[in-house]
């Protein structure tokens, strides 16, 4: 250790934080509760970042202009940008790479396509997809909720939104999952992925995306997201081609794994909570709130979202230097007892309006309505079709740089007499 590093260690409060240790993904809450009770902020040496643990401090950062979303503001941005160069344009021109003025411009173009009314037009297609997946497995005694079900839903919904043929779904699904993982390379300290495999899926997906956009330029459609974005690009130069590719790529990447894990975690928590499940069965209108409670109680993120200091600043008593990374430990913030009563209880009737699961401020997730609709239909339908479904075994978790990755969730199906 150099003298400079030693001096830094003396001024940065360090705590034992091992989000990639065995068993963490299965149940991170005892570890993060100890951290939250001990300190509002600490320095994570392995992750080269600060970590915020408490709700109010995390919530405030979402609207604090001293913190940037763009990785370009990170002191290690050059190193990050060079990791998996095939994604360099997505990192630079995607919503999380744009400066505030460009971010606002792009979000203004995108937001109309993600309103609740616009997304509700996809309800029939999502229901059809869900029914087809369950019909194909209805004769089975066992069922993997992740591989046999959840993985088949989000890309079909996104393809319907973008009016992309179903034959593209699997390639785009691989692209979405690979991109979400690849964006963690260089951002978090451990990546077990075979980089060549990630690059192959990313390259395949980008080529397909360019082809889809070229075809839509030649044959524009009415009431179509891609046509609207392309015409905005052509009419006013408001979207560059790189921005357009990065934006659509981000829609695919952000909407794939997140929705898969939301469905899986929702099924898991409802099966583990018979009283909650009976409430949701008796009152289907509770399902949307139950999904929000899943994300509060058992959040799918391994660590959380990141911000980067735009200037030297003091926060929670810590001296944060310009360019340093700050992780917002979302699963910890959402178990903060100063905000949520009985925070360690799964309560599907809870008021979840204070949840930070989808972010806050100008960077709130634009795909919230779509993810909620997919999960609402997927989870509601599977319990309606198989009301006596039971867990067969504990879920199998794998590695993912961003998510608590449930790889397999095996259940025993007991279909109702009505089918």
Curated annotation (Swiss-Prot):
Cofactor dependency: heme
Going by the UniProt record, its keywords in alphabetical order are: Heme, Iron, Metal-binding, Monooxygenase, Oxidoreductase
UniProt lists the gene as cyp167A1
Molecular functions per Gene Ontology: heme binding; iron ion binding; monooxygenase activity; oxidoreductase activity, acting on paired donors, with incorporation or reduction of molecular oxygen
Binding site residues for heme: 365
Q: Which organism is it from?
A: Sorangium cellulosum (Polyangium cellulosum)
Residues bound to substrate are: 180, 304
- Its Enzyme Commission number(s) read 1.14.15.-
Q: What is the protein's name according to its record? A: Epothilone C/D epoxidase
GO BP terms: namely: epothilone biosynthetic process
Q: Which family does it belong to?
A: Belongs to the cytochrome P450 family.
List the CDD domains hit by this protein, alphabetically: P450_epoK-like
Q: Mind telling me which SUPFAM superfamilies this protein's record contains?
A: Cytochrome P450
Q: Which domain of life is it from?
A: Bacteria
What's a Pfam family this protein contains? Answer: p450
Known catalysed reaction(s)?
epothilone C + 2 reduced [2Fe-2S]-[ferredoxin] + O2 + 2 H(+) = epothilone A + 2 oxidized [2Fe-2S]-[ferredoxin] + H2O; epothilone D + 2 reduced [2Fe-2S]-[ferredoxin] + O2 + 2 H(+) = epothilone B + 2 oxidized [2Fe-2S]-[ferredoxin] + H2O
Q: What does this protein do?
A: Involved in the biosynthesis of epothilones, macrolactones which have a narrow anti-fungal spectrum and microtubule-stabilizing activity. Catalyzes the epoxidation of epothilones C and D to epothilones A and B, respectively.
Associated pathway: Secondary metabolite biosynthesis; epothilone biosynthesis
């Amino acid at each position: 250790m150099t003298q400079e590093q030693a001096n830094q260690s003396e001024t940065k409060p360090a705590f034992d934080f091992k989000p990639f240790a065995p068993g963490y993904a299965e149940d991170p809450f005892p570890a993060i509760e100890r951290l939250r009770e001990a300190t509002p902020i600490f320095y994570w040496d392995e992750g080269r970042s600060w970590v915020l643990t408490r709700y109010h401090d995390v919530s405030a950062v979402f609207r604090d202009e001293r913190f940037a979303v763009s990785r370009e503001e990170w002191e290690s941005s050059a190193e990050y940008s060079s990791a998996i160069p095939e994604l360099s344009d997505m990192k630079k021109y995607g919503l999380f790479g744009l400066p505030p003025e460009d971010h606002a411009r792009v979000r203004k173009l995108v937001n109309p396509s993600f309103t609740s009314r616009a997304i509700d037009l996809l309800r029939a297609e999502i229901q059809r997809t869900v029914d087809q997946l369950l019909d194909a497995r209805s004769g089975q005694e066992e069922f993997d909720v992740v591989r046999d079900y959840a993985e088949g839903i989000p890309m079909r919904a996104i393809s319907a939104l973008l009016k992309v043929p179903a034959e593209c779904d699997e390639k785009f699904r691989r692209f979405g999952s690979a991109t979400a993982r690849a964006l963690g390379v260089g951002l978090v300290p451990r990546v077990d992925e075979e980089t060549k495999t990630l690059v192959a899926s990313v390259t395949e997906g980008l080529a397909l995306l360019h082809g889809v956009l070229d075809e839509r330029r030649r044959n524009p459609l009415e009431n179509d997201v891609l046509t609207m974005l392309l015409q905005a690009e052509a009419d006013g130069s408001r979207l560059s081609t790189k921005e357009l590719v990065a934006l659509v790529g981000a829609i695919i990447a952000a909407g794939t794994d997140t929705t898969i894990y939301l469905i899986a975690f929702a099924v898991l928590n409802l099966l583990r909570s018979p009283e909650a499940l009976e409430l949701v069965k008796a009152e289907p209108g509770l399902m949307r709130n139950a999904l929000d409670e899943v994300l509060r109680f058992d959040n799918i993120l391994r660590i959380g979202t990141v911000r980067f200091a735009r200037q030297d600043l003091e926060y929670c008593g810590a001296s944060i230097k310009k360019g340093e990374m700050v992780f917002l430990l979302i699963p910890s913030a959402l178990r903060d007892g100063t905000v949520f009563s009985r925070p360690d209880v799964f309560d599907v009737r809870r008021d979840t309006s204070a949840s930070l699961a989808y972010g806050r401020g100008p960077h709130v997730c634009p795909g919230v309505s779509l993810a909620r609709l997919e999960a609402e239909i997927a989870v509601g339908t599977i319990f309606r079709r198989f009301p006596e479904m039971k867990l067969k075994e504990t879920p199998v978790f794998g590695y993912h740089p961003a998510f608590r990755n449930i790889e397999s969730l095996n259940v025993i199906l007991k279909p109702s007499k009505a089918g």
